Amino acid sequence: MALDSVKHLPIHGVSAFSSVTVEIKSFFSTVKPRKTSTFVYAFVVTFVALTVFLAFSPSPITVALAPSISSYVLPNITVSNSSNSSPSSLDSNFTTLRTPAPENLTAVTKNLTFESPVANGTTDTNAKTITIQFQTGHAKENISCPDNKTARDLDTHGARKAPLSEVLAVNSTASPKRKQRRKSSLRKVIESLKSCEFFEGDWVKDDSYPLYKPGSCNLIDEQFNCISNGRPDVDFQKLKWKPKQCSLPRLNGGKLLEMIRGRRLVFVGDSLNRNMWESLVCILKGSVKDESQVFEAHGRHQFRWEAEYSFVFKDYNCTVEFFASPFLVQEWEVTEKNGTKKETLRLDLVGKSSEQYKGADILVFNTGHWWTHEKTSKGEDYYQEGSTVHPKLDVDEAFRKALTTWGRWVDKNVNPKKSLVFFRGYSPSHFSGGQWNAGGACDDETEPIKNETYLTPYMLKMEILERVLRGMKTPVTYLNITRLTDYRKDAHPSIYRKQKLSAEESKSPLLYQDCSHWCLPGVPDSWNEIFYAELLVKLDQLGGKRRRKALKDHRS
């Protein structure tokens, strides 16, 4: 009966026992004495039964012995080896997936969309592959590690960057059960976000907000630090944006830092993007274990008027940067015939700082407010293309030309296989009774707009932006925060924009209000939560492409 239990186990469609029986019969044909024949026959049958049992046993101990035994008595077990490796290269766990030796690491293909060659399933034909086919009846494919190190794929310390398509992996230090729960929870969140329209919803009160304690972040620019400047009400900080179709995940600073480990996250635009950048830096800084490992890259404290600024998160070897470029194209000067200089705006040239950030891993652009100022609105002897200064040019046409220049630059200089590009929409102002330089005010606003009929009509400039984005080759994720932000007339600095007023400001403090920027903590934190949700979805999609490519390569 013991023999019956093993003789039906096929190896490549051949009965192991039948092939062994033939050899046993031929062996005994040379043995004459009956007693000796009976003894030897029993011994060999017992040996073969034991050998077959050991070969197919799942026990780690018996499995470790299987190759050496089966290589002698089970000739139908095949070992494929593309590099002429011997069965002795098998380890004690009888593994079928091998990592090639360092000398066999070969560059095969360039990384695709934040992916390493390992992640996207690229294989090295010289990699050592040991496949024991009798386990499943099918060959196993090797996963190789080509050494495709380029400066773009390495962090500032020379270490290989993990593919952004893999950064959603759950912390491997957790227990298996806890790790699986986290992974399952994250998967549910991401799936809910994929079918969600983030920009349609309501502002709801949540006492667990803000994301960081007011006054806890010493990096906030004075004009955004409303509570420190004396603002008495705090309810505006306890509102979060709630899409109708889903719930945005609370921004997990630690998770986001893992997502950008070894990378550059760069904001480019006007002071409203600086508003968003400072918000994110504060959220991330509050999530690290040792805040002394977060510092200014250039050692400057006053950075409001600097052209660029960068914070380093040393433990994560990443930077979160801001480049001031309010128009995204170059501010210029021309010399008149009488020798005087006149300011112009070059609609055909991107900002000078573009060379410094074109290789960033994640880019967040914006422009808008400076196009509403008097000089840009009039468009008289201001807009320039080449050596031509237009005597008169409509501001919306100038805006279209500038964004087209920016879009062409992105298509030419930003590699969509290496970088993610975002564009944040226009952030509405809420001046009442005049503009920012004409007595406009918002200091009595402590509640958001409740009736959407009071919202500002969608700007023509944002429609122009959408047309430009649709015409680009490079995928750009549009953070259309305009309408949801328009509700928040209650969250501007207003008169709480600075601690010490000048003598002139002290005479009429209500005449000097900021109803464009946002208090921090505040509305930009919600922009960043939407940005975080978009990142989760985008990176999951990249990971899906990587997995599909690996599967396709496997099948081919």
Swiss-Prot record:
Motif (GDS motif): 269-271
Mode of membrane association: Single-pass type II membrane protein
Lineage: superkingdom: Eukaryota
Chain ranges passing through the membrane: 38-58
Family of the protein in this entry: Belongs to the PC-esterase family. TBL subfamily.
Gene encoding the protein: TBL1
Additional facts recorded: Contains 2 motifs that are conserved in esterases, but it is unlikely that this protein belongs to the catalytically active pectin esterases.
Native species: Arabidopsis thaliana (Mouse-ear cress)
GO terms for cellular component: membrane
Localization (cell): Membrane
Extent of motif DCXHWCLPGXXDXWN motif: 514-528
Pfam families, A to Z: PC-Esterase, PMR5N
Sorted UniProt keywords: Membrane, Signal-anchor, Transmembrane, Transmembrane helix
Biological processes per GO annotation: cellulose biosynthetic process
Protein's recorded name: Protein trichome birefringence-like 1
Listed GO MF terms: O-acetyltransferase activity
